[in-house]
């Protein structure tokens, strides 16, 4: 079975978040587990791409100059589609709908040029939605994964219709139209043979008005047709392994964390209070405003360490706290520092308003750091109550109550050790999800 993944980013070649992490792990595990699986990944050839693909082809695709490059790693063939639209710094820009329409038009003709004919095409998030539509119109078997429904790839349809290369009949509510806009997420949902989300709970949540982002009616229909399901993301357990992590003093059990905790205290000048940390985009979705609102009470019992960037108002608020002796804030993203935080913290805060799956809580538990999470999406599916601390309402008081429960547990070393040992023993490898996807493909 020839499987083709399409995504806007893939670790380690291009990455801005969890989507890149998934595409950096899932295809390699599928290639290892699937005896008959040939796995290829197609992604844009960004000017900032980390790596040097070997050029395979250069020509025209849908009337536009295009080129394809190749890298092979871990049994996976990585193809990179070059277009003029992607020859600028960074990954994402305000005109991304137009850019990924160009990608969506050119992808299949470029693959034709090098003889890539997949049995199953698996698109990821709205940037791949147009490719899924074109593939379905060709009669290919297709799957589409929603990693975050909030981002949909919308643009005025009157202006954008000509960017798509789709026939006119697709520009209605049963196709790609959404309140007068082109909606590339909706293209993926409507044209895929099967749609997955990245956790079972999120698959249920997005059929409701609270989480459906205006697409809940379509998602309810897909559920009734048996075309929507949730498959949990896994974790790259080689990349995130406290036993072999080069960025920390390695350890294999909760007692071994002491060196990492001491190092983090020294790095940020923290006192002996337990460390509550988060590594996150600073965004409304992540509930960082709840954490900031809770800081006056949190610092009575906790040191608080935050690594992240995003919303300027949230960054400014955290910067304003940075002189407090129990608060440390590092702006931006820094992977070696992230490793040190996951290892050196005692607890990890994720007060998300919604969380399709979440990887941070999986990493935290892998490192024996106990999550404090809101019961939503993948957080509800992955953090057992006997390991972490959960709360239901997206409010600062509810979050604080969960933090108090964690603080009380921390005062009982035996209980904390038991929870941390359980956390480190949980299996969130990609093997199970990879098998589920392969089984899904066979049923398309």
UniProtKB/Swiss-Prot annotation:
PANTHER family: ALPHA AMYLASE DOMAIN-CONTAINING PROTEIN (PTHR45825:SF11), GRANULE-BOUND STARCH SYNTHASE 1, CHLOROPLASTIC/AMYLOPLASTIC (PTHR45825). InterPro entries: GS/SS, Starch_synth_cat_dom. Pathway: Glycan biosynthesis; glycogen biosynthesis. It is an enzyme of class 2 (transferase). One of its GO terms (biological process) is glycogen biosynthetic process. It holds the Pfam family Glyco_trans_1_4. ADP-alpha-D-glucose binds at residue 15. This is Glycogen synthase. One of its GO terms (molecular function) is alpha-1,4-glucan glucosyltransferase (UDP-glucose donor) activity. Belongs to the glycosyltransferase 1 family. Bacterial/plant glycogen synthase subfamily. Keywords: Glycogen biosynthesis, Glycosyltransferase, Transferase. It catalyses: [(1->4)-alpha-D-glucosyl](n) + ADP-alpha-D-glucose = [(1->4)-alpha-D-glucosyl](n+1) + ADP + H(+). The keyword Glycosyltransferase applies. Synthesizes alpha-1,4-glucan chains using ADP-glucose. Its EC number is 2.4.1.21. The gene is glgA. It comes from the Bacteria.
